[in-house]
Amino acid sequence: MKQCFFAVDLGATSGRTILGTFTPEGLEMEDVNRFPNHLIETGGHFYWDIYELYRHIIEGLKIVAQKKDVEITSIGIDTWGVDFVCVGKDGGFLRQPYSYRDPHTAGAPEAFFKKVARKQVYEWTGIQVMNFNSLFQLDTLRRNNDSALAAADKLLFIPDALSYMLTGEMVTEYTIASTAQLVNANTRKPEDALLRELGLTENNFGRFVYPGEKIGTLTKEVQRMTGLGDIPVIAVAGHDTASAVASVPAMNPDFAYLSSGTWSLMGVETKGPVITEETESLNFTNEGGVDGTIRLLKNICGMWLLERCRAAWGQISYPELIAEANASEPFRSLINPDDVLFANPADMEQAIQTYCSDSHQPVPQTRGQIVRCIFESLALRYRQVLDNLRTLSPHPIETLHVIGGGSRNELLNRWTANAVGIPVVAGPSEATAIGNIMIQALTAGTAKDIASMRQLINRSISLETFYPEDTDVWDTAYLHFKQVTMNH
């Protein structure tokens, strides 16, 4: 009977469940099921369908229950950050959770800073100010006299809501609460002063847990539905990026990571928060990591731009798009991927064209020109953020590890290496699921520490290294990029 770990890994556009097994050769993983995750738009708001996500998790567990040679040791859930469910006094969900893409938080930080100074909020939390942080979502709901929040007894972040559906136990996991901007970066506990401003207390949240702690076991109902026994559900790093960073296959500590998916998150691991005027002005974030680490990082708009264009273009493969981009003229048009114009436009291609027109650049017309514009702009934006990160990091940065789905994008990896001027190591692409499984394995005693797990991943997975080329050309392009994005 193989000892296996069941990982639930949910992103903003898709989800999957995965079985991970440790063998003498390393880590083996197999997909159980994959499924889309859609935004639902109704009544002028955007929601997630948490019941549909739960149904897919149950389906995955049913599939595994039918495998005769597999015994699940534990289950772990990670998801995207900041969104949450309002739970009533009777334990039921009061409505589907709002999505962070919902427009109702426009201007929300400024409204909150009238009550608590921006500087004070950053000193407590060390978290990058973004409209959709849970802190601002909650304050928006409160200002709007939202009926679900008014009736809520508990608030559960998405991974904690799903573990509650499986176990009946309500917890608040540290990494997901940290990215919400509700945790004090130094004490690593919820910041009471912020909760008070929201009309909340710690009693409105589940039991506070850290990665590696047990949440509970599958309820009798879930056991009956799936055919499984009383399997424990473990709090992994509930925030997908924290799980992904745990899996970085680094052999020495002098690295930066780029978790590349719908969002790109670039940062370094530190032993404690770095909260200074400089990190605040550059809007860097200090998010909770595994094993007592802090992830000093910045959010960058990632493959979202291409995902939205691709959805509009219909059936076209990535290899086709990349070939078209490769054949297009270099550095013809550049954009700031983080411009508010690209947050959630009705037509992403049109938004890119508008940006280029407004900044007096050639307007991309073909698919290849659009994709080339996105990739070159991302690579140059990565350089800009890495330059800032070097000044903030307590250690030198000699290598950039690209992990997550974007690590499979060979063209973008090559251009990123050219832009940043240091080697780029690509992989693993399933970083989040691997980190999720790693934390479960550490809890089960299968491995002794994070460092040895990283070495094991380095041995188990084929990694590709990209070395910088054409750096003079990219240096010139970077100056142009800074000029274009500064003036827009």
Positions of PLM-derived features:
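Active-site core segments that coordinate phosphate-bearing ligands/cofactors
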Residues: 7, 21, 113-125, 131, ...
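Short glycine-rich phosphate-binding loop at a beta-alpha junction
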Residues: 70-79, 154, 207, 392-404
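Stable alpha-helical structural segments in soluble proteins, enriched in small hydrophobic residues
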Residues: 56, 60-68, 373, 377, ...
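Structured loop/turn residues at beta-strand edges in well-structured enzyme cores
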Residues: 70, 92, 203, 253, ...
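Glycine-rich beta-strand-to-loop/alpha-helix junction loops that act as flexible
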Residues: 78-82, 211-212, 260-263, 399-407
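Carbohydrate-associated surface elements
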Residues: 102
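Short beta-strand-loop/turn "lid" adjacent to the catalytic site in phosphate-handling enzymes
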Residues: 42, 62, 67-99, 128-132, ...
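N-terminal glycine/serine-rich phosphate-binding loop of ATP-dependent small-molecule kinases
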Residues: 1-95, 123, 223-233, 420-422, ...
